[in-house]
């Protein structure tokens, strides 16, 4: 079995190293990640300049002067000697729940695998900090091992959020749907040394829908949240109303 591992925190991130160590016994592992932290990069590709791939002497990890999506794209379309059986992304420093998934470079790296027909799993550690990173890596390896032995049908994309707790305090796995956040905090305006205004993106909003069954609810109650995602963004329930709206405009066929 072959696994392609990436992340969005960069090739020097502790989460990547911990997950690499945990996955080594399970499969032939190739690690390729961004050179720099790319949190919030989403599914962006670098199209305005060429990309270079280097290899770290200390770890053997490949790193790209681009985004998480660039990293997986390069590996799958031009660098990898053989097609992987699974793309894994993480472990991210902080959760990716609800609308976070649209901004997340961690989820984006996994999504790029799905774009090329390779199943993928994204792992994130809830709350900033690595206090229980070894425990999270152990959980991630258990999930990957189970997937390799019992794969889901099709090309699944799983988004996994692991509470930042000791392993023995985790209550197990729970399959969830995405919750919803309040809008993010306003931008923070400051002034640069030349007197020009600059802006920092504000913090993410708190949970709005953290009801039972959501990723927010699961991790708040000590469960590992596993959310199956899909690339089709079509709002199918809105199709009939949208057709009627278009007909009323006199242009629908």
Curated annotation (Swiss-Prot):
Protein's cellular compartments: Cytoplasm
Entry GO CC: cytoplasm
Reactions listed under catalytic activity: a ribonucleoside 5'-phosphate + H2O = a ribonucleoside + phosphate
EC number: 3.1.3.5
Sequence intervals crossing the membrane: none
Gene Ontology molecular-function annotations: 3'-nucleotidase activity; 5'-nucleotidase activity; exopolyphosphatase activity; metal ion binding; nucleotide binding
Protein name: 5'-nucleotidase SurE 2
Source organism of this protein record: Burkholderia lata (strain ATCC 17760 / DSM 23089 / LMG 22485 / NCIMB 9086 / R18194 / 383)
